[in-house]
A protein has these predicted regions:
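Alpha/beta-hydrolase fold active-site loops
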Residues: 23-25, 158
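Post-Walker A helix-loop "phosphate-sensing" segment adjacent to the P-loop in P-loop NTPases
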Residues: 44-54
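PAPS-dependent sulfation machinery
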Residues: 56-159
Length: 247
């Protein structure tokens, strides 16, 4: 539904296609390595804009600067997120969610149908493996289309965005955003994946009554080991001045 609305709006507002996304900042790294707290910290800088949960969830019409902090959709999305906590009790204590908090890029990419978001919520290992093998050129082009839409009535000097999943697709990200800067966060992998596996168990409890923590932990370790390897391979082809490490 969101995708159809965005495509329709883009066709009726040609100025959307003329929006320029300049020098965006992307935060990535294994999950539970401090990406979220760093994201929310940098988003406080007035020279950056981050896509808020409410505008990613309900992007039609594009947000306006004058009503950005009072838009009626904020309240509606907050109610929706409260329902998510009822479905997966305890999730909010593990990972902060809120209509006005910065949202991850997996939710933007989900409307292009290739996204880690689905694998976090459901036990779909074949899909996740398939997604890692896909050419993401069109997906990151869609990512740009989404940002163009969000800023058409509320310009952004620079965007700051975040998703651990970008680690698997750095070559596609940089091909779409050649002037992007990338922050790669670090933590002991065992600690990071153990913490993330706990998050996945909690999140999936809202969609399944067959949660196997051991199987989830084993799969997440294998999955993100592959993602980290993909990220290191892609990074070797990037300028050292484009990627910054934080630990």
């Amino acid at each position: 539904c969101v995708r159809l609305q965005l495509v329709d709006f883009r066709g009726r507002r040609p100025q959307v296609t003329r929006q320029s996304i300049e020098r965006p900042l992307f935060i990535t790294g294994l999950p539970r390595t401090g990406t979220t707290i760093l994201y929310e910290l940098i988003a406080q800088d007035p020279s950056f804009r981050s896509p808020a949960s409410w505008e990613v969830t309900r992007p039609i019409p594009p947000p306006k600067e004058a009503s950005y902090n009072s838009d009626k959709r904020i309240r509606s999305v907050d109610r929706q997120l409260a329902l998510a906590e009822k479905l997966s009790p305890g999730f909010r204590a593990i990972h902060a969610i809120g209509a006005e908090l910065p949202q991850e890029c997996v939710y933007i990419l989900a409307s292009h149908f290739i996204s880690e978001q689905f694998g976090y919520m459901y036990n779909i290992p074949k899909y996740r493996s398939w997604a890692l093998s896909q050419d993401m050129t069109a997906s990151y082009r869609w990512h740009t289309n989404f940002l163009q839409h969000l800023q058409v009535d509320f310009g952004a000097e620079h965007w700051v965005m975040k998703a651990p999943a970008h680690l698997a697709y750095l070559k596609y990200l940089v091909a779409q955003y050649p002037d992007a800067a990338i922050i790669w966060t670090h933590r002991k992998p065992l600690d990071a994946i153990t913490s993330f596996s706990s998050l996945v168990c909690t999140l999936r409890s809202g969609f399944s009554n067959a949660i196997n923590p051991l199987a989830i932990g084993q799969h997440e370790m294998q999955h993100f080991s592959k993602i980290a390897s993909m990220g290191m391979l892609d990074r070797s082809a990037l300028s050292a001045r484009q990627v910054f490490d934080v630990s």
